[in-house]
Amino acid sequence: MGQTALARGSSSTPTSQALYSDFSPPEGLEELLSAPPPDLVAQRHHGWNPKDCSENIDVKEGGLCFERRPVAQSTDGVRGKRGYSRGLHAWEISWPLEQRGTHAVVGVATALAPLQADHYAALLGSNSESWGWDIGRGKLYHQSKGLEAPQYPAGPQGEQLVVPERLLVVLDMEEGTLGYSIGGTYLGPAFRGLKGRTLYPSVSAVWGQCQVRIRYMGERRVEEPQSLLHLSRLCVRHALGDTRLGQISTLPLPPAMKRYLLYK
């Protein structure tokens, strides 16, 4: 199977990424990422919650970013403002590599998951109320103290994927899965069995003064009908490929059709 490329993913693709098996992304993800991103108001509406975070975290820019204070022997978490129980959702996390430290965990949590611990740990995923991927160690955590945590994505023995600054979190509440995408490639489901819950974007951090950004990419619901016009646009864009979308303006098409193909 060839690599499953997705639109609007991170442009930084590690060379080791090709060593990992790829998976078909959740139904509707390509369409979600091909659409214009939500405006700034909507992104803040789905951003970090200043009222639902550790006391050592300062939420900034209306929810688009948080900064962890330099407190020793503390792990600190934050939840998003919106919880999701239906539909397909995707959001981008930006976390500089030099600001991750020993435990940098990205995932989802219920409203009951703890947001602070008096030691350094993978807080997100430490109990039954949260699920997380440690993007430094490449380990998955759920009800875990870190012992025998599975590697994600599964690859050649001893080979660990270097996670770039930007990664995409993909939560499919229709199928009950949580997965991740980097460099435009979906890495497959990391967790299953999430149906019936309300889950919030979440991270836990240990690095003093780290700044972690969130950018909500949108939502798709299974009951949303897809028009023939919309499906035709997807086919044309897929046939051109990301590298040739700039040539749409040169095609012998009416101006209105060109604008539609470019989501203008």
UniProtKB/Swiss-Prot annotation:
Residues 1-34 are annotated as: Disordered. It comes from the Eukaryota. Changing residue 198 to A: No loss of interaction with PAWR. Residues 1-19 have a biased composition (Polar residues). Pathway: Protein modification; protein ubiquitination. Residues 26-221 form the B30.2/SPRY domain. GO terms for biological process: intracellular signal transduction; protein ubiquitination; ubiquitin-dependent protein catabolic process. Gene3D superfamilies: 2.60.120.920, SOCS box. Belongs to the SPSB family. Component of the probable ECS(SPSB2) E3 ubiquitin-protein ligase complex which contains CUL5, RNF7/RBX2, Elongin BC complex and SPSB2. Interacts with CUL5, RNF7, ELOB and ELOC. Interacts with MET. Interacts (via B30.2/SPRY domain) with PAWR; this interaction occurs in association with the Elongin BC complex. Interacts with NOS2. This is SPRY domain-containing SOCS box protein 2. The lineage of its organism: Eukaryota, Metazoa, Chordata, Craniata, Vertebrata.
